[in-house]
Every structure is written in C-alpha cells, then in structure tokens.
C-alpha cells in the first residue's frame, strides 16, 4: 500500500507545572466545545501538499494486514506504570481507515471506562520525511452530547512515513451523568506543523460508538484539607483496563485571589511499592471559576497482591503562563482495596 505523507498527530503541549497528563482544556459545564481555527500569520506561507483532495474509505483489516506496526498500536505507549497493559484485550476494535490527499488516517482501538475515553490511531504518509515534526490535527475528537472535555494526546514516530497516536480524554456531561453508550466523532479537516510550514488538508470523517465497561465501584468519601483547600475523594472504580478516582475540591477565595488556578495532581502507590501516578492528573469541570472543582483521573489496573492504595493529592497553585506556581501538599488518603 502506498499511502505515505508525513504527519505526526495532534500533540498537546502541557504546562510544566501540570505535568504530561494534566488538563488541556477544562470547560465549564454549559460551555460549547469550540472549534480550533488557524489564526497564525505563519500559515499564510504554509506549503499545502496536494493540488486536489480525494477521499477513500475502506475496511481496516485489509489495511492492518499490510502494516505490521498496526497489530498492536497500544504497545508503543505502555510504560512503567502499566497504564495500558489490558487495553488491547478489553478495548473495542474500531477498524476504520480513510485516505485523503495521500494521508491515511486509521483508528485502531478504543475504550470507554465509564468516564474516560482512550483511542489508539495511526497515520501513514505518501512521502518519507526524516526530520522530527510536531503535527497537530485542526479538530480533535468529539463526544456527542458532551459539554466539553479535557485530556491529552501522545504521538510516536514509527518510521519516516508511519506514526502512531494515543488520545486520552474525559468528556463532561450535564450533572455528571455519564451514559452507558457514547457516540464518538472525528473530522480532523487538516494536519499541520507550524515549525515546518507543512499542512495537509483532507476529507476524513469518522463516527463510532463505545459501550461503557462494567466496573466495581467502591465509595470512599474521605476528606483531607489545609487552611484554604478541601479535597474529597468520592469514589474509586475498578474496570478491566483502568482504575478511576472521582473527587471534588473546594478552594477558598483568599487562595484564588493570590493564584489564578489551583489544580490537583496525584502521587498514587500501593502497599507493594508499585507507582500508578507520579504528579499527573485528569480532567474536570468548575461552575464557579475554580472555587469548586469536580474531576476524575484514571490509571492502570491494580497490581495483583496489593491490599492498600495510597493516594496523595498535591494542589498546584499557579499564576499560569509560566509565571510561577507553588505546591500545596495534602495528607495521603489510604484505601483498603475490597476488590
């Protein structure tokens, strides 16, 4: 198959103080998800590849059979925290691929654990480009009926013409009522690199549904606090691919007057010494400019033999835009695992 043009994928640069999986977009519950548009003058000089647009959709198995690295995209992203070790086993095989303007976009697998969505995908290009580039999609994934979302994206270059990506995000629904089935859409419209003045426009359009994984919910409702911060761990849910913590925090006005945002990150270990999160976070919503914040974070499945989970919240009080921050450590919450 000769579908080869270069692109890395939608890659979100996370502020240093919020680490690599912090919130990239916390949108209020009633805010409509906005479409990102090019407004950078650099793009006026962008070299647009391709004089015309063609679009071809085909069944994914016929593509995967010719592309060895597509047998298990998630394997490129597994880490020491074992975050995705069961993804391939319990995720849904999406099997969608479309080619437009010489760029093939392929969606491999996806999973919805009841709050968070993880999608593995790949790009294959018509043209070999050896230099490293940061490539972004004009539009990100959308969940029908959600009011917004926060999440992160990763991209790994497999070869000069092949890239694999992993998107993880948390959609937000009114009153935190997460449906049993979600509808996912994605219309990238273009992939671009500002650093290399490269843009590929095309006609890709994907739509698929995901059913919620069954999980075991353990209520916690334990609160830790300092003078200006109150943090409540509400629950923890165990699924075949992930562990999801849900929480709520309340910040006093005095702290918000000094700092523009106060966002939690977590250090999570078990009694055997396994590390599940180390200064990272997830998505959430705030109806009152950060005074109250409801969120969730997910990590991999609990390692066999562990009987306790130690969750240590750390509040990042920040001026944003790299202007400075402080860390506010809270007491750890110890959960006896009933699973």
Model-derived segments and their meaning:
Residues 33-64:
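Internal signal-anchor transmembrane helix that establishes type II topology
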Residues 1-38:
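Disordered, charged N-terminal biogenesis/targeting segments of membrane/secreted proteins
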Residues 4-6, 10, 19-22, 54-339:
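Alpha-helical, hydrophobic structural elements that either
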């Amino acid at each position: 198959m000769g579908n080869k043009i270069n692109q890395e994928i939608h890659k979100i640069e996370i502020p240093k103080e919020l680490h690599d999986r912090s919130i990239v977009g916390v949108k209020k519950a009633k805010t409509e998800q906005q479409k990102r548009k090019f407004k950078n003058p650099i793009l006026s000089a962008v070299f647009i590849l391709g004089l015309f647009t063609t679009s071809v959709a085909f069944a994914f198995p016929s593509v995967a059979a010719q592309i060895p690295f597509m047998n298990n995209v998630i394997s490129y992203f597994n880490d020491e925290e074992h975050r995705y070790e069961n993804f391939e086993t319990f995720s849904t095989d999406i099997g969608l691929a479309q080619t437009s303007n010489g760029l093939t976009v392929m969606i491999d697998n996806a999973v919805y654990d009841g709050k968070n969505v993880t999608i593995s995908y790949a790009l294959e290009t018509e043209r070999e480009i050896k230099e490293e580039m940061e490539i972004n999609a004009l539009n990100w994934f959308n969940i029908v009926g959600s009011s917004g979302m926060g999440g992160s994206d990763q991209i790994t270059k497999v070869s000069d013409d092949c890239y694999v990506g992993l998107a993880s995000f948390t959609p937000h629904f009114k009153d935190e009522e997460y449906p049993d089935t979600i509808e996912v859409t994605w219309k990238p419209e273009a992939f671009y690199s500002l650093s290399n003045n490269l843009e590929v426009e095309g006609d890709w359009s994907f739509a698929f549904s995901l059913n919620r994984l069954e999980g075991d919910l353990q209520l916690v409702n334990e609160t830790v606090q300092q003078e200006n911060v109150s943090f409540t761990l509400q629950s923890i849910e165990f699924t075949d691919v992930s562990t999801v913590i849900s929480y709520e925090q309340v910040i006093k006005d005095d702290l918000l007057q000094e700092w523009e945002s106060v966002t939690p990150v977590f250090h999570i270990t078990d009694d055997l010494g396994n590390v599940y999160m180390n200064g990272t976070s997830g998505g959430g919503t705030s109806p009152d400019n950060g005074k109250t914040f409801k969120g969730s974070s997910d990590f991999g499945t609990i390692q066999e033999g562990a009987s306790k989970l130690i969750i240590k919240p750390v509040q990042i009080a920040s001026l944003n835009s790299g202007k400075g921050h402080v860390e506010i450590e809270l007491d750890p919450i110890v959960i006896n695992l009933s699973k």
